[in-house]
Amino acid sequence: MKKVNWLVVAAGLVVGAAAVLLTALGNPGNMGFCIACFLRDTSGALGLHSAGVVQYIRPEIIGIVLGSLIAALGFKEFKGRGGSSPALRFVLGMFVKIGALMFLGCPLRMMIRIGGGDLNAIVGLVGFVVGIFIGTLFLKKGFTMKRAYNLGALEGSVMPAIVVALLILLIAAPSFIHFSTEGPGSKHAPIAVALIVGLIVGALAQRSRLCTVGGIRDAMMFKDFKLLYGFIAVIIAVIIGNLITGNFNLGFEGQPVAHTDGLWNALGMALVGWGSVLLGGCPLRQLVLAGEGSADSTITVLGMMVGAALCHNFGLASSANGPTQNGMIAVVIGFVVVAIVSFRNVAKEA
């Protein structure tokens, strides 16, 4: 077993502590950080969906991308690159988001929910691990999304430019941007604090390569536990923080922005895990890669935002009352699509 990478552990502890802090300062319960939820809220703010309770441009998303950009520039790792099956990445990003909104959270929120005592998230974790395991089977068989190409700094700057525009819109708050007055979208930490925390998390995630999928994938495939320690560190930090603030609530019932349908919690996260393995990283990792110049990750993030819009425009997203019929059908379709991509992209020479 390789040595512990203390930078990954430190990054995990900071992410967990940041999640607790942001919740204490106004973010929804067990949602200090959630890439899926925050991209959904941002999509709503831009008018891509009309669910009035989940519309807000989340500064944390802006901060993560810009923090990654700053770190990548500082260590000369910013590089415009892309062209690796962009259309497939867009579609996979869309279905990863559909799976996440079936569960009501990305892998990072799953960890934060576990740290808050939400046992439904343990069920989600089981599905997540199974999905990652299925993905690794295809990696071992030679799955590939084809090579990426050097595309230049301008192409790599697209996502940073998008989030700068989002920051301007957040601060200016023009009338065509939608902001929730009730529900999860109306609950948020102060803009400056959320932005600064996002910058720190983005920079640390870029330097440490923290990835909620990568930790489990590497442990399964290579017996390499470095990234997995970061995964565990997030949960430990959230547990400690919630115990200190009195927000630890062990159980299945009455958890914030969660439902108790175990089967669909597991299936939603299985779809997230499988799709994320094919994409090369979890939603957090995709934001970080987009910040350091990956056009492929930018396409993936845009796919996730469209996926969020589809979820709320067509009734695919779950609620505290449980999953919807439309959402169940969409997740099943997602498994079919991910399976087709997995089988078709196994290298012929493998």
Residue spans of the language-model regions?
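Membrane-interfacial helix-loop segments of redox and metal-homeostasis proteins
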Residues: M1-A350
